[in-house]
């Protein structure tokens, strides 16, 4: 049997709409991500378990994991009979890369089960394609960090899909999911078709300078540049309490705060454990809306999708 875990991811990371993503994992060892187990079988089967299993489609054929199995078999040119078990530990429509997580973990598990017939580039192309079935268009800002780990910048030039942007070891990423769902399609539809020239210039400056600050090891500058002029001004209205939360965590001492993907999860970056704990406490008390919500203090997950030992 092969068992694979893939971590949650932050799409956009505020400053890099559709071109920057980061994988995160809780510091306390909680699995904030999906697991898939694959075993030999006479015929295909898919079972689901986990905290958020009731949010999955009732019919296995509608599950993206089943579709990933189908597409993987097409890619390798043979039907591979397996029994798959999906452990859904990620809420759907959360802004944590839930669909990307299921795509990555399913394809990595199948590839490992079959002796890795596909290389990383082939896998990443498949992942982007499968993610596109759910999000409506091929993009890699969740699947790339989920698969490869760390913070990934989408290049999509010279045959290179993404490359790593170095993060900062002392950054703690406080992730707060309020327990409500935001449709990615709705969050995209609310964005304007055209942007002002000044916004385009600002966006380019923030992203270029952020990547520069990461490579030249300037954490204070990098945090200062984590500004979103593309999505956040419009998506805030879809996220009850986000504006107040951003102000509050900044007052506590967070270096930056933004929307994870299309929301409703937010992230706040801190460089001290005591600050992160205070931010987490405030978000737990004021940003969560029901029992499905949660807050985790995380670090960048530099490993990405990986085999697990039972």
Curated annotation (Swiss-Prot):
GO molecular function: ATP binding; homoserine kinase activity
Subcellular location field: Cytoplasm
Enzyme class: transferase
Residue numbers binding ATP: 91-101
Keywords per UniProt: Amino-acid biosynthesis, ATP-binding, Cytoplasm, Kinase, Nucleotide-binding, Threonine biosynthesis, Transferase
GO cellular component terms, semicolon-separated: cytoplasm
UniProt entry tagged with the keyword rRNA-binding: no
EC identifiers of the protein: 2.7.1.39
GO biological process, one term: threonine biosynthetic process
PROSITE patterns per UniProt: GHMP_KINASES_ATP
Substrates-to-products reaction catalysed: L-homoserine + ATP = O-phospho-L-homoserine + ADP + H(+)
Main location: cytoplasm
Keyword field contains Transferase: yes
Pathway the protein takes part in: Amino-acid biosynthesis; L-threonine biosynthesis; L-threonine from L-aspartate: step 4/5
Function: Catalyzes the ATP-dependent phosphorylation of L-homoserine to L-homoserine phosphate.
Family the UniProt entry places it in: Belongs to the GHMP kinase family. Homoserine kinase subfamily.
Name of the protein in its database record: Homoserine kinase
Protein species of origin: Sodalis glossinidius (strain morsitans)
């Amino acid at each position: 049997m092969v068992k694979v875990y893939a971590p949650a991811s932050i799409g956009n990371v505020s400053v890099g709409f559709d071109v920057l993503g980061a994988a995160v994992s809780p510091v306390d060892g909680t699995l904030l991500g999906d697991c898939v187990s694959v075993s030999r079988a006479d015929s295909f089967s898919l079972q689901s378990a986990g905290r958020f299993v009731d949010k999955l489609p009732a019919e296995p054929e509608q599950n993206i994991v089943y579709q990933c199995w189908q597409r993987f078999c097409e890619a390798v040119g043979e039907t591979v009979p397996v029994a798959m078990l999906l452990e859904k530990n990620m809420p759907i429509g959360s802004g944590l890369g839930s669909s990307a997580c299921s795509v990555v973990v399913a394809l990595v598990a199948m590839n490992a089960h079959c002796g890795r017939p596909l290389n990383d580039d082939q896998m990443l192309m498949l992942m982007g394609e499968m993610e596109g079935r759910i999000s409506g268009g091929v993009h890699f800002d969740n699947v790339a960090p989920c698969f490869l780990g760390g913070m990934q910048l989408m290049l999509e030039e010279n045959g290179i899909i993404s490359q790593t942007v170095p993060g900062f070891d002392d950054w703690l990423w406080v992730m707060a999911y309020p327990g409500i769902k935001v449709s990615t399609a709705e969050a995209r539809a609310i964005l304007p078709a055209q942007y002002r020239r000044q916004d385009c210039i600002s966006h380019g400056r923030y992203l270029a300078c952020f990547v520069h600050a990461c490579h030249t090891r300037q954490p204070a500058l990098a945090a200062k540049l984590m500004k979103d002029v593309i999505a956040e001004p419009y998506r805030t209205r879809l996220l009850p309490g986000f504006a107040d939360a951003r102000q509050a965590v900044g007052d506590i001492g967070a270096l930056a705060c933004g929307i994870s993907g299309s929301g409703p999860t937010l992230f706040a970056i801190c460089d001290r454990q005591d600050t992160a704990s205070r931010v987490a406490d405030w978000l737990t008390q004021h940003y969560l809306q029901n029992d499905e919500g949660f807050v985790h203090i995380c670090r960048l997950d530099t490993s990405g999708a990986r085999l697990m030992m039972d």
